[in-house]
């Protein structure tokens, strides 16, 4: 038998997926699906076979799980016939195989079998139109499953056989079940009341209703009045014929098969079948060894019809000898109606499944009793001893040889005792065990019925027949035949546990002599090879040629510590010598400890000078030479650089030394750190050499360090917010305050501070927020050169640089670097072409320029007004006029700027008052006639008519104007900060 557990889990799950797809996951609850899945996995561990036979004369294998046969796959009645609503399974009465739809309460019931209404033959599950053998006696299945005709009795006559040979052309009505009146049916009365027969009761055609008879069973098959039924009785079965053309309003109830209250006991014979691999199904199988003397013939009555009368009579005589009748007279009373429980297939219940099924025996033969007797005796003797030892092998996980070996260890319970216990459990679960039945049954009958109950509950779905081989174990073979070991018990061959043999083996190994671990001291070993008076002498001897004094490297006064005694293995521990019992253990331990210390702590003593003189001449010369070598002065080792220096490196060093020797030594000036002079000297240097340009100083620092400094110093929690790229709503964009940032900047060194500033100018937001903090720190540390660099950096962000430019210029003006600052502004920040775009920056530049040396850049101011149409504000002109009143050259340049827009100047009272005061002071110095002709240039233009003056140009609106110039976040974030031109 193949082991199903070898099938991969993926294949099992694919089958389960097909089941779920077919039924639908919503058809059952989750708890029911879990129960079904456990039973589904358990079903793969059960042995099974597939009976492909459709021949009703061949019984099903009762010791294996058989796939149910489908009925009426093809319609034998023509196109006008209709199939039954539920499947019908054809099965002989003497077969105890499981049925298609069993349940816990239906284990005793049998299925109805259909017969052809035309000829009275038993109709197979598949139409005989396509069958190869028209007669069941010639079927190949009849040749394969040959078994003795156990249920054929001597009551049947040759006339009855001839009637069956004529196919029972005349229809016979079924007599009453318990009270037959027909004389021709009297011979069949034992079979009519047998418990294994299908008993049907039909209503008459004209009778509208039919009440239950007192002798009838509670579960009967009742057909509708319109249905036609013909009853055909055989030697082995009582079949029912249904006309499927009739109306479907039929009521089918199953009859309990093993009801024992109103039926007589049927005589059965032991059937034994042998399963072999389905390689050649046409080869007949040999019977079991304990049934070799019995006749092994065909099991079909139809096959008996094909025999000659002479052979048939001989067969009938042989069957009479082997047939055992057990008659039982019982009262004909209706059995209690069975309760039908809703549940799944019994094959899914693990408790009702057996690893092996014995043969179904209604009456044990003498051979079965002889086999069971030694089993009962052995069980009673060794039940208590074998119970903790015997373990049942896992179900469905062993092959046939392993299964037989494992069954040898399970001899603690006999066959009939185990069957009776499980039958009791099944009957209690179904609720059909009553006191009345128990009182009316004998132990043998209970056992036989239990076997039938168990066999009827082992139905399970099987798999393909070509993939697995059938079971080789003989059916009905008791456990004693399979478990035989060559160990005589009471002069007989009985079953012996393997564990018992293992126990004897272990006892034998324990009784074997083991080598004793003798612990011997080294002293004892020495005493064996030495005499009693001989001992090791470690003292000095003049005759010794060699001495171990040279191995001493310590000092003379050195105290040598005693070595701790070495821990030896447990087997090598020193055992005390046997001494009289009067002595105590303490002196023995002390003596042994002193002995161990005296031996292990021994060292060869160093020789003194006196002892050295007494040494032999050879040893004396050796010692003297060693002392001379120690007193010699060791030569100084060569420098390691010269010793280990490679040749190429030494040649290169020599060339460098020769080159340096040929050149004269030159002195190089020592330069101080750049841009770290005092403020006073710096102001003097700038004023003396105004053309000097201070370069920008950049320090190389890694970007990663700068990013880390930015996070720590400024307290930035979201780097995406620095570049205005954060899209999160709940992100934290808060930073440290200006005071906290300035405290951190003050504690930094100069290089770190400058590096952090270079990282800051890369961000528009950080530049706008912390620019003034860096200006204050550089001013506090007198780093004026870095302030000039910061002044130039205002060109990077022109839209926000107007207040920043004023702040840094104010810091530079305090140290006297105004001209240098104006020069940097006019070189890098002055952009007349973008004056209208960055009006704030241009106005701030004009304010700085009007308060500084504006006369040096008068041409640029004139160009700004004429070429770029940017009018200089009046407040800047007023500042320029006030600063040039005392100087005639500057005043002349100021008048040039004023005359650019004479109409707007005339409306300004401040400018007109300054000009009038200037003209009065100039006329006071000269005569009035000369003052009119030699007045300041441009004075005559003020008297010109307004029409002669060119109208002023319209101003372009300022798109980059900031209404609230602050150092915090503003709307100027969207301006392209990289557009510097």
Curated annotation (Swiss-Prot):
Is this entry keyworded Cytoplasm?
Answer: yes
Required for interaction with rhi/rhino, as annotated region:
1-60
Location comes to:
Nucleus; Cytoplasm, Cytoskeleton, Microtubule organizing center, Centrosome; Chromosome
Biased segments, Basic residues type = 377-390
For the biological process aspect of GO, one term held by this record is: oocyte localization involved in germarium-derived egg chamber formation
Gene symbol here is del
Subunit note: Component of the Rhino-Deadlock-Cutoff (RDC) complex, composed of rhi/rhino, del/deadlock and cuff/cutoff. Interacts (via N-terminus) with rhi/rhino (via C-terminus); this interaction is direct. Interacts (via C-terminus) with cuff/cutoff; this interaction is direct.
Sequence segments annotated as region (Disordered): 72-195, 274-307, 327-352, 375-446, 554-586, 642-662
Q: Where is the composition biased (Basic and acidic residues)?
A: 167-191, 337-352, 409-419, 652-662
Quote the function comment for this protein.
Developmental protein involved in oogenesis. Required for germline maintenance, stability of mitotic spindles, localization of patterning determinants, oocyte growth and fusome biogenesis in males and females. Also required for dorso-ventral and antero-posterior patterning of oocyte and eggshell. May be involved in microtubule function during oogenesis. Part of a rhi-dependent transcription machinery that enables the generation of piRNA precursors from heterochromatin while maintaining the suppression of transposon-encoded promoters and enhancers.
Q: Which UniProt keywords apply?
A: Chromosome, Cytoplasm, Cytoskeleton, Developmental protein, Differentiation, Nucleus, Oogenesis, Transcription, Transcription regulation
What's the protein here called?
A: Protein deadlock
> Under the cellular component aspect of Gene Ontology, which terms does the record hold?
centrosome; cytoplasm; heterochromatin; nucleus; Rhino-Deadlock-Cutoff Complex
Species of the source:
Drosophila melanogaster
Report if keyword Oxidoreductase is assigned. Answer: no
Q: Where is the composition biased (Polar residues)?
A: 104-113, 150-160, 422-446
């Amino acid at each position: 038998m193949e082991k199903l557990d070898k099938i991969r889990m993926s294949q099992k799950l694919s089958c389960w997926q097909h089941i779920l797809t077919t039924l639908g996951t919503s058809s059952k609850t989750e708890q029911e699906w879990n129960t079904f899945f456990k039973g589904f996995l358990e079903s793969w561990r059960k042995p099974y076979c597939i009976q492909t036979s459709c021949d009703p004369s061949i019984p099903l294998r009762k010791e294996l799980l058989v796939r149910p046969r489908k009925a009426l796959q093809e319609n034998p009645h023509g196109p006008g016939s209709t199939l039954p609503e539920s499947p019908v399974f054809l099965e002989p009465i003497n077969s105890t195989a499981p049925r298609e739809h069993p349940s816990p309460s239906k284990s005793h019931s049998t299925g109805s079998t259909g017969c052809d209404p035309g000829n009275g033959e038993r109709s197979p599950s598949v139409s005989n139109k396509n069958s190869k053998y028209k007669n069941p006696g010639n079927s190949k299945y009849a040749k394969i499953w040959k078994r003795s005709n156990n249920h054929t009795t001597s009551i049947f006559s040759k006339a009855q056989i001839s009637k069956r040979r004529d196919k029972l052309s005349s229809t016979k009505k079924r007599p009453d079940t318990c009270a037959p009146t027909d004389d021709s049916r009297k011979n069949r009365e034992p079979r009519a009341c047998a418990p294994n027969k299908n008993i049907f009761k039909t209503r008459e055609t004209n009778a509208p209703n039919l009440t239950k008879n007192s002798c009838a069973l509670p579960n009967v098959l009742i057909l509708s009045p319109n249905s036609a039924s013909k009853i055909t009785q055989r030697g082995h079965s009582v079949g029912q014929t249904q006309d499927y053309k009739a109306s479907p309003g039929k009521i089918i109830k199953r009859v309990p098969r093993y009801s024992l209250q109103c039926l007589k006991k049927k005589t059965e014979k032991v059937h034994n079948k042998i399963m072999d691999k389905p390689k050649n199904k046409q080869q007949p199988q040999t019977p079991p060894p304990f049934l070799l003397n019995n006749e092994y013939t065909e099991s079909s009555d139809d096959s008996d019809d094909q025999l000659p009368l002479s052979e048939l009579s001989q067969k009938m005589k042989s069957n009479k000898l082997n047939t055992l009748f057990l008659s039982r007279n019982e009262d004909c009373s209706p059995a209690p109606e069975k309760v039908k429980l809703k549940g799944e297939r019994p094959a899914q219940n693990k408790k009702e499944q057996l690893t092996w099924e014995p043969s179904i025996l209604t009456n044990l033969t003498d051979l079965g009793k002889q086999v069971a007797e030694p089993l009962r005796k052995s069980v009673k003797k060794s039940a208590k001893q074998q119970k903790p030892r015997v373990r049942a092998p896992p179900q469905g996980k062993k092959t046939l040889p392993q299964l037989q070996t494992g069954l040898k260890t399970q001899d603690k319970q006999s066959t009939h005792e185990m069957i009776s216990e499980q039958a009791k459990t099944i009957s209690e679960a179904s609720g059909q065990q009553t006191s009345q039945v128990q009182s009316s049954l004998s132990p043998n009958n209970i056992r036989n019925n239990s076997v039938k109950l168990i066999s009827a509950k082992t139905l399970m779905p099987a798999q393909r027949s070509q993939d697995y081989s059938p079971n080789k174990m003989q059916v009905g073979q008791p456990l004693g035949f399979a478990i035989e070991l060559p160990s005589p018990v009471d002069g007989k061959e009985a079953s012996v546990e393997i564990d018992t043999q293992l126990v004897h083996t272990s006892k034998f190994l324990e009784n074997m002599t083991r080598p004793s671990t003798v612990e011997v001291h080294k002293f004892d070993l020495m005493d064996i090879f030495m005499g009693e008076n001989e001992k090791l002498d470690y003292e000095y001897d003049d005759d010794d040629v060699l001495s171990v004094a040279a191995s001493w490297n310590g000092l003379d006064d050195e105290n040598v510590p005693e070595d701790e005694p070495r821990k030896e293995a447990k087997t090598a521990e020193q055992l005390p010598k046997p001494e009289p019992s009067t002595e105590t253990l303490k002196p023995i331990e002390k003596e042994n400890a002193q002995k161990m210390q005296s031996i292990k702590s021994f060292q060869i003593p160093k020789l003194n000078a006196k002892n050295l003189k007494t040494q032999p001449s050879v040893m004396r010369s050796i010692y003297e030479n060693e002392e001379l070598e120690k007193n010699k002065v060791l030569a100084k080792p060569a420098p390691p650089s010269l010793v280990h220096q490679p040749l190429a490196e030494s040649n290169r060093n020599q060339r460098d030394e020769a080159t340096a020797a040929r050149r004269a030594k030159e002195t190089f000036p020592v330069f101080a750190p750049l841009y770290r002079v005092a403020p006073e000297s710096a102001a003097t240097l700038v004023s003396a050499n105004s053309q000097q340009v201070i370069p920008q100083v950049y320090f190389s620092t890694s970007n990663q360090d700068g990013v880390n400094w930015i996070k720590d110093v400024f307290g930035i929690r979201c780097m995406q917010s620095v570049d205005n790229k954060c899209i999160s709503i709940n992100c934290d964009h808060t930073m440290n305050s200006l005071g906290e940032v300035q405290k951190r900047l003050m504690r930094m060194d100069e290089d770190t501070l400058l590096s952090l500033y270079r990282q800051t100018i890369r961000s528009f937001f950080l530049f706008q927020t912390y620019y003034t903090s860096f200006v204050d720190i550089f001013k506090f540390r007198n780093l004026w050169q870095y302030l000039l660099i910061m002044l130039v950096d205002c060109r990077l962000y022109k839209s926000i640089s107007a207040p920043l430019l004023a702040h840094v210029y104010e810091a530079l003006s305090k140290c006297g670097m105004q001209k240098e600052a104006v020069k940097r502004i006019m070189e890098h920040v002055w952009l007349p072409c973008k004056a209208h775009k960055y009006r704030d920056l241009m106005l701030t530049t004009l304010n700085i320029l009007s308060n500084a040396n504006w006369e040096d850049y008068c041409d640029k101011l004139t160009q700004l007004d004429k070429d770029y149409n940017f009018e200089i504000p009046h407040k800047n002109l007023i500042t320029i006029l006030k600063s040039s009143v005392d100087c005639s050259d500057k005043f002349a340049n100021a008048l040039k700027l004023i005359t650019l827009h004479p109409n707007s100047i005339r409306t300004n009272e401040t400018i007109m008052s300054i000009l009038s005061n200037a003209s009065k002071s100039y006329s006071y110095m000269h005569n009035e006639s000369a003052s009119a002709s030699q007045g300041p240039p441009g004075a005559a233009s003020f008297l010109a008519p307004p029409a002669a003056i060119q109208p002023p140009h319209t101003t372009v609106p300022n798109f980059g104007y900031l209404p609230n110039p602050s150092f915090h976040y503003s709307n100027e974030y969207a301006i392209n900060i990289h557009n510097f031109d």
